[in-house]
Every structure is written in structure tokens, then in C-alpha cells.
Amino acid sequence: MNNNSSILFGLFDEFLWIRCSGRGSFANSPTVKSLGDDYIASGGRLIVIDLETCSGIDSTFIGTLAGLSRRLLPIGGSVQIASPSERCLSALESLGLDALLSIEPPTAPWRGKVEQIRAALGTENAPSVHLDAKEQTLHVLNSHLTLSEMSEENEEKFRNVTDCLKEELERQKDQ
């Protein structure tokens, strides 16, 4: 992760809270994915992504959230978004994530406790997940494939990206 972003997290009775400060991007989305994967594997069903201090989110970060949500929905779980800025909300909505994620749900178990939750997170960053070049390319590809599967519009929007990433994986295979 670069110095301009941080991922804080905490496990609470009913949910995993992940707070992204700075930019949510391809650089820190593997950390978010790892936290979510571990939580789901342990039986967790509700992941809350706190975007209050997030200055923006890229398509890889959004695709990572979509991937976690698509894993949780069939087992009765969900990904919820807390305090998104207008910029982050617009980015989520532009790719159709408002249909997949619960954005500021009024009856969420964390409602009325947000400040206490944030205070309980402390200041230590989540351990960064470092991927090698091939793993990073695969992560970015999978995030964009997830977004592409959501709508024809997304598929068209990301076709060049996914094609280039597939070609890059082929080149990396030969090295």
C-alpha cells in the first residue's frame, strides 16, 4: 500500500468492519479481499466497508467489493457501504454496484454505533497483502471480469482492459 492510503479493520459481534482511508485502489484491494475471504471462511456473513475518509475508488477496488458480495449473497450475507462520499457513491452507482451492495442501509446492526466502531479500530493498518506481478495481474483481471459479468455496459466498458490483462498473463506464463 502506498503512504496515502490505509486499511483498518475490526471484527465485531455481527460483522467485519473495513475502513479505507485515502484511495481504494488496485494497490490495497488485495488486502480488502484477503480480510473478506478470511472472514467468510470463518463463517462471517456481513462485511461493512467504511468509505468516510476514502477520496476515491478505482474499478479494481470496486470489482473486489463486487466479488465479495457475490460470494456472500448466495449464503444469506452481504457487503454494506457506510458513509460513502459523493465521489465514491457515484463510482459505485456508475458500475451498477448499488444493486449488489447495501449502501447506507437504514436497519444495519452498526447504525448508531459508527463513532464507537471507528474508535475501536485503532490506528494500526491491516497487514498489506503483497502480490507478485502475475498474482496482481490475475487479481486485477478477476475484479474486472466480475464487473463485466454484471452488465453488458460494464462488459463493453472493460473489454479492452480484460483483453490486455489476459494477454499480459499469457506473456507472464512464457517468462
Question: Residue spans of the language-model regions?
Answer:
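STAS-like cytosolic regulatory interaction modules
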Residues: M1-T53, R70-Q175
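Histidine-anchored nucleotide/phosphate-binding helix
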Residues: L65-S69
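Residues immediately C-terminal
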Residues: G56
